[in-house]
UniProtKB/Swiss-Prot annotation:
GO terms for cellular component: extracellular region. Occurs in 3 forms, M-PONTX-Dq4b has an amidated Ala-28, U1-PONTX-Dq4d has an amidated Ala-28 and an oxidized Met-20, U1-PONTX-Dq4c has no modifications at either Met-20 or Ala-28. Keywords: Amidation, Antibiotic, Antimicrobial, Fungicide, Oxidation, Secreted. One of its GO terms (biological process) is defense response to fungus. M-poneritoxin-Dq4b: this synthetic peptide has antimicrobial activity against Gram-positive bacteria B.amyloliquefacies S499 (MIC=0.1 mM), L.monocytogenes 2231 and S.aureus ATCC 29213, against Gram-negative bacteria P.putida BTP1, P.aeruginosa PaO1 and E.coli ATCC 10536, and against the fungi S.cerevisiae, R.mucilaginosa and C.cucumerinum. Not active against the fungi F.oxysporum and B.cinerea. Expressed by the venom gland. The lineage of its organism: Eukaryota, Metazoa, Ecdysozoa, Arthropoda, Hexapoda. It is found in: Secreted. It comes from Dinoponera quadriceps (South American ant). This is M-poneritoxin-Dq4b/U1-poneritoxin-Dq4c/U1-poneritoxin-Dq4d.
Length: 28
């Protein structure tokens, strides 16, 4: 289910979100 998918990928997702956040702050 979705929870299993999230648990499998959350570390990578968090890293990507952090990078996107940094890029957004730098662009602003």
């Amino acid at each position: 289910g979705l929870k299993d998918w999230w648990n499998k990928h959350k570390d990578k997702i968090v890293e990507v979100v952090k990078e996107m956040g940094k890029a957004g702050l730098n662009a602003a």
